[in-house]
């Protein structure tokens, strides 16, 4: 869980920026995106195959 503690003279804007950066680095939004709907084993294999093809292309 990501937590941001406000400093004594810190504004809300900078704290929000720090929070967004921490969430992005932790990969929380990507995890939520993948768990939004159930992914069948077939869909998982297809997604991984497409990712492997993309990775191989570069």
Curated annotation (Swiss-Prot):
Pfam family, any one: Ribosomal_S21
Gene3D superfamilies, per database record: Ribosomal protein S8 (1.20.5.1150)
Protein name, UniProt field: Small ribosomal subunit protein bS21B
InterPro entries to which the protein is assigned, alphabetical: Ribosomal_bS21 (IPR001911), Ribosomal_bS21_CS (IPR018278), Ribosomal_bS21_sf (IPR038380)
GO MF term set: structural constituent of ribosome
Organism whose genome encodes this protein: Trichormus variabilis (strain ATCC 29413 / PCC 7937)
PANTHER family: MITOCHONDRIAL 28S RIBOSOMAL PROTEIN S21, SMALL RIBOSOMAL SUBUNIT PROTEIN BS21M
Gene Ontology CC terms: ribonucleoprotein complex; ribosome
PROSITE patterns: RIBOSOMAL_S21
Assigned keywords, A-Z: Ribonucleoprotein, Ribosomal protein
Primary gene name: rpsU2
């Amino acid at each position: 869980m990501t937590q941001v503690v406000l400093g004594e003279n810190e504004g809300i804007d900078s704290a929000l920026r720090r929070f967004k950066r921490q969430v992005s680095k932790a990969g929380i939004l990507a995890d939520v995106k993948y768990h939004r709907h159930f992914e069948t084993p077939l869909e998982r294999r297809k997604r991984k195959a497409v990712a492997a093809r993309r990775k191989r292309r570069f």
